[in-house]
Structures are given as C-alpha cells and as structure tokens.
Amino acid sequence: MKQYLELLNDVLVHGIQKPDRTGTGTRSVFGWQMRFDLSQGFPLVTTKKLHLRSIIHELLWFLRGETNIAYLKKHQVHIWDEWADATGELGPVYGKQWRRWAGADGHEIDQIRWLLEEIKRNPDSRRLVISAWNVADLPQMALVPCHALFQFYVANGKLSCQLYQRSADIFLGVPFNIASYALLTHMLAQVTGLAVGDFVHTLGDAHLYANHVEQASVQLERVPRPQPVLMLNPAVTDLFDFTYDDIVIEGYDPYPAIKAPVAV
C-alpha cells in the first residue's frame, strides 16, 4: 500500500491549507490517482488496523438499496450514525441511487442490476458506469456522495474498476473506500465469470483534516506489511446473495489502530 502512503505524505508535506464545510480546516491537493493490481493481494491498509466489519457491512448495505442505518446498527456498524436523523434515515444516499434511481418518467432504475447484465451482454461497452450523484436528490441527502461515480472495464478476461471520488478524507475515509470498491470488483468478477484486474482510484479534493495531522505522521513512520488475500465463497453466483460470512480476509496483520475524530 505504498501508493496510499505516498498520497498521505504528499498532502501532509505539500497540501494547501484550506477551510472546509465542517469548520475543521484541511491540507489538500487537487487531482490524485492510485492504481492497485487486485491479483497481487487485497488492497487493505496495513499501517493501521481497519474495521473490516464496517467495510463489508457498509457495502452489503449499499447493495441492498437501503438508506436507513437500522441494518448497520444491527451489525454493530456505526460509521453513519452522526448523519442519520432520529428515525435512522439518511435520505436518498448511495443505496437509493445504486438500486432505485428515479427516472424522468417516474420509474426506478436499478443501476447495479443493469450493470451486471451489461457486463455479461456487452463487456466491451464504455458505458459500464454507475453514478450516485443525482443532482435533483442532493438537497435531501444527509451527506452528498463523496465517492460519486465508478466505471468498469473488461479486457483479457479481467474486470477492472475506476472510482472518481470528488471529496477524499485521506486519513479516515480513503482506506475504507479503497477496500470497499476492491471488494465490489471481486464480487462482480466472480458472478460474471471474470478474473480481477485493477482498481484505479481517482481523487478530486484529497484532504487531510487539521486534527488528523499528528495521526498521519505516526502512520507514515510504519513500514507496510504484506497484503492480505480476499476469499469469497465460490458457491455464490448472484451478487445480491453475498452475506458477511461469504467474505473472508486471510493474512491481515496490521499495526494497531490509530484513532482520529470524524469531521461531520
């Protein structure tokens, strides 16, 4: 995961100090790209321990098309708690847009199911794109999409993914985002009969919050350890049938976690 540490170091050293929506203050750079060969190990940050249960359950929650945190709370995942209202609702966030995008004529579009069918039917398409950035729905969202758009690419029997992330909290958020979209790529590859290719992560505003600087410095002192391996239950042939128990990370040997406050 040297790619991630290079980003962290660059923003720490060269980032421009800017105010932000949360009032915390950031150092940021604009435009950064990382590439991970998914056949060479699962891109899970090892220089601090990540909460795997949160990463996996959040992705499964997105794929369920849900926008209420009840499912997450049931599985002891609290990463969305600060943004939910008293009933646990977040408005039309990722799950709604992925699975139930409101079409102009009123019918709902299941982008993920369409993507599955299109990869099988037309793998060379340049339109294998999913968007969570629904301009009409943004005012109703508790938090507008940070990871806004992603595209798939099939070549030589391998499935690759590129994510565009408009806003990237590089200490807390980006390690989760890398793992989440790498996991999604593996899952999609399995159910479409493909091998995995690359995960390409393109960042817009890549920022380090002012109250994460000390933690980032600690992390940069640590030498990355070998990447773990993702094992998916080979019996699963439908993307929507995956459960938490079907997803296993083997050989994850991280350094201790580094706590940092979330900017809300």
Curated annotation (Swiss-Prot):
- Keyword annotations of the record: Cytoplasm, Methyltransferase, Nucleotide biosynthesis, Transferase
The pathway noted for it is: Pyrimidine metabolism; dTTP biosynthesis
Q: Name one GO biological process term.
A: methylation
InterPro entries with a match to the protein in the record: Thymidate_synth/dCMP_Mease, Thymidate_synth/dCMP_Mease_dom, Thymidate_synth/dCMP_Mease_sf, Thymidylate_synthase, Thymidylate_synthase_AS
One annotated Gene Ontology cellular component of this protein: cytosol
The protein's predominant localisation is cytoplasm
Residues holding dUMP: 21, 126-127, 166-169, 177, 207-209
Family matches, as Pfam families: Thymidylat_synt
Keyword Transferase in annotation: yes
Task: Spell out the catalytic residues.
Answer: 146
GO molecular-function annotation terms? thymidylate synthase activity
Q: Which domain of life is it from?
A: Bacteria
Q: Where in the cell is it found?
A: Cytoplasm
Q: Which EC number(s) does UniProt give? A: 2.1.1.45
Positions bound to (6R)-5,10-methylene-5,6,7,8-tetrahydrofolate: 51, 169, 263
Task: List the catalytic activities from the record.
Answer: dUMP + (6R)-5,10-methylene-5,6,7,8-tetrahydrofolate = 7,8-dihydrofolate + dTMP
How does the record describe its quaternary structure? Homodimer.
- Function summary: Catalyzes the reductive methylation of 2'-deoxyuridine-5'-monophosphate (dUMP) to 2'-deoxythymidine-5'-monophosphate (dTMP) while utilizing 5,10-methylenetetrahydrofolate (mTHF) as the methyl donor and reductant in the reaction, yielding dihydrofolate (DHF) as a by-product. This enzymatic reaction provides an intracellular de novo source of dTMP, an essential precursor for DNA biosynthesis.
What protein family does this chain belong to? Belongs to the thymidylate synthase family. Bacterial-type ThyA subfamily.
Stated name of the protein: Thymidylate synthase
Source organism phylogeny: Bacteria, Pseudomonadati, Pseudomonadota, Gammaproteobacteria, Lysobacterales
- Recorded name of the encoding gene: thyA
